[in-house]
UniProtKB/Swiss-Prot annotation:
Component of the ClpX-ClpP complex. Forms a hexameric ring that, in the presence of ATP, binds to fourteen ClpP subunits assembled into a disk-like structure with a central cavity, resembling the structure of eukaryotic proteasomes. Belongs to the ClpX chaperone family. GO terms for biological process: cell division; proteolysis involved in protein catabolic process. The keyword Transferase does not apply. The lineage of its organism: Bacteria, Bacillati, Bacillota, Bacilli, Bacillales. ATP-dependent specificity component of the Clp protease. It directs the protease to specific substrates. Can perform chaperone functions in the absence of ClpP. It holds the Pfam family AAA_2. Residues 1-54 form the ClpX-type ZB domain. InterPro entries: AAA+_ATPase, ATP-dep_Clp_protease_ClpX, ATPase_AAA_core, Clp_ATPase_C, Clp_protease_ATP-bd_su_ClpX, ClpX_bact, P-loop_NTPase, Znf_CppX_C4. One of its GO terms (cellular component) is HslUV protease complex. Keywords: ATP-binding, Chaperone, Metal-binding, Nucleotide-binding, Zinc. ATP binds at residues 118-125. This is ATP-dependent Clp protease ATP-binding subunit ClpX. It comes from the Bacteria.
Length: 420
């Protein structure tokens, strides 16, 4: 504590102007003084602003239509899934907003969401975009890395640590965040699977996830890893954390077919054709997930199920060009920085999309296909001032030939290389 000399008189608070006799304490700085009353006032102002910033995303909750409009800017197709997500997320945060003194006996329970669809159909992107729309912390976890307590692998609490880190260790903010757990179908119990790791990363992990899905105060190791008896823990309440679970659930169509079997038998082949993969997924029920290997208690914690469609060539072409951050726009911008124009022909876009379908990677594989066709160009162009335009053709994608290169006069530079 700063001690005043006896010969110093008329010391005043530099903020409110009160003499030292009018306040309990006067703290000195470099040529300035502040009294205890002003310190308390400043503390209150800072606390109010912090509280306001923490709840800002929640108080400005967009409507389901506004949420879907924002999703449409970044995610192409999947209209049903986007609508289901928009309504579910809106209801979740509306529920948080109205928490407080109970005016009646109606308790609004949390509704976590399951996204079922093939690899590359947009499950992760949907979850990421939702978090950005709502300005809440977001974390991604892979269910295959989780194991039952006592085995090598991640505890389920490590999922919460990622969310806390995304919130810059602001626990209040983290408690209103979103966690996306991918490949949730990989922790389904399957009697025909003889893998030992399936036993410790299957039903045991489902049991461990139950509490945090429903809502509990979890103890999280600040450095991650396994818990130790004398380790200081971070306490976090998961009641208001929204969990979105994603998985491809390969083969679940057969489970649905068995359930619908008596309805399909006796139909003509044309009628049976209606039960294609997409139509079957649209009829998924909780009992199908249970038959697939998820335990009933786990299914009960995830009441909302949205299925994503397999992306066809048209959808993938739209994904390449239409979103705000579309890949074609990204690579075009990248080459613009080297004063080079980049162009994709319609046939090239179709070829990229067809190759992604052939590889069964969906939208997730589009970037790697473009990267493969452009890697040499992005290496050479910065040191070749003659090139002002690059054109990606179907031949570039299908035959892995060099893209067409043009100079400032529009002359094709590498004609001999592309004519093969």
């Amino acid at each position: 504590m700063f001690k005043f000399n006896e010969d110093e008189e008329n010391l005043k608070c530099s903020f409110c102007g009160k003499d030292q006799d009018q306040v309990k304490k006067l703290v000195a700085g470099s040529g300035v003084y502040i009294c205890n009353e002003c310190i308390e006032l400043c503390s209150e102002i800072v606390e109010e602003e912090l509280a306001q910033n923490t709840s800002e995303a929640i108080t400005e909750l967009p409507t389901p239509k506004e949420i879907m409009d924002h999703l449409n800017e970044y995610v192409i197709g999947q209209e049903k899934a986007k609508k289901s997500l928009a309504v579910a997320v809106y209801n979740h945060y509306k529920r948080i907003q109205q928490l407080g003194p109970k005016e009646d006996d109606v308790e609004l329970q949390k509704s976590n969401i399951a996204l079922i669809g093939p690899t590359g159909s947009g499950k992760t992107l949907l979850a990421q975009t939702l978090a950005k729309t709502l300005n809440v912390p977001f974390a991604i976890a892979d269910a295959t890395s989780l194991t039952e307590a006592g085995y090598v692998g991640d505890d389920v609490e490590n999922i919460l640590l990622r969310l806390i880190q995304a919130a810059d260790f602001d626990i209040d903010k983290a408690e209103k965040g979103i966690i996306y757990v991918d490949e949730i179908d990989k922790i389904a119990r399957k009697s025909e699977n003889t893998s030992i790791t399936r036993d410790v990363s299957g039903e045991g992990v489902q049991q461990a996830l139950l509490k945090i899905l429903e809502g509990t105060t979890a103890s999280v190791p600040p450095q991650g890893g396994r818990k130790h008896p004398n380790q200081e823990m971070i306490q976090i309440d998961t009641t208001n954390i929204l969990f979105i679970l994603g998985g491809a659930f390969d083969g679940i169509e057969e489970v649905i077919k068995r359930r619908l079997g008596e309805k399909v038998i006796g139909f003509s082949s044309n009628e049976a054709d209606k039960y294609d993969e997409q139509a079957l997924l649209a009829q998924i029920r909780p009992e199908d997930l249970q038959a697939y290997g998820l335990i009933p208690e786990f299914i009960g914690r995830v009441p909302i199920v949205a299925n994503l469609e397999t992306l066809d060539v048209t959808a993938l072409k739209n994904i390449l060009t239409q979103p705000k951050n579309a890949l074609v726009k990204q690579y075009t911008k990248m080459l613009e920085l080297d004063d080079v124009d980049l162009e994709f022909t319609e046939e090239a876009l179709s070829a990229i999309s067809e190759k992604a379908i052939e590889r069964k990677t969906g939208a997730r594989g589009l970037r790697s296909i473009i990267e493969e066709s452009l890697i040499d160009i992005m290496f050479d162009v910065p040191s070749n001032e003659n090139v002002t335009k690059v054109v990606i053709t179907a031949q570039t994608i299908n035959e892995e030939t060099e893209p067409e290169l043009y100079d400032a006069e529009g002359n094709l530079i590498n004609n001999s290389k592309t004519s093969a």
